[in-house]
Amino acid sequence: MHGSATDPLVYPHPTTPQPGELTEVAPGIQWLRLALPFQLNHVNIYLIAHEGGWAVVDTGIGDDKTKTTWDNVFNGPLKGTKITKLIITHSHPDHLGLASWLVDRAKCQLVMSQTEYFNGMYFNSRRTEGQIADQADFYRRHGIGEE
């Protein structure tokens, strides 16, 4: 069942979850939508049943709002459930941003490619005043406010 590039999008799930709400999209797969503070206003995170707990795919951005959302998920629908591993798909900050925090909190294994790991480390280490100003300008141009 393949369409053409001009066919309308077909969404496999009838509703979009609210930010911070877990939604089962298939047996053993949960969808978690996390808010982002820019024009692209969310990132999709997935939890896959694994070894009696959940393997988490990506983390959301590294800010306090996202940490609070994760805390609510851990204290609500995932209460008493183990996170078995964290899988990072790529080193963009909305996918990798809370990796260290989540691994520390869940005491789980981190899984990601070596290339993406080094990309993330490289961009995180380049914190000069000029680089921070360049990043701030980039994010402003893409819809993030001054705060």
Describe the predicted segments one by one.
Residues 14, 37, 91-92:
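Charged, low-complexity surface patches
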Residues 1-14:
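N-terminal presequences and immediately downstream first alpha-helices
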Residues 14-15, 100:
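Amphipathic, soluble alpha/beta structural segments
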Residues 19-81:
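Conserved beta-strand hairpin/beta-sheet module of binuclear metal-dependent hydrolase folds
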Residues 71, 75-147:
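Active-site HxH/HxHxD metal-binding segment of metal-dependent hydrolases
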Residues 10, 60, 88-89:
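A generic secondary-structure micro-motif detector
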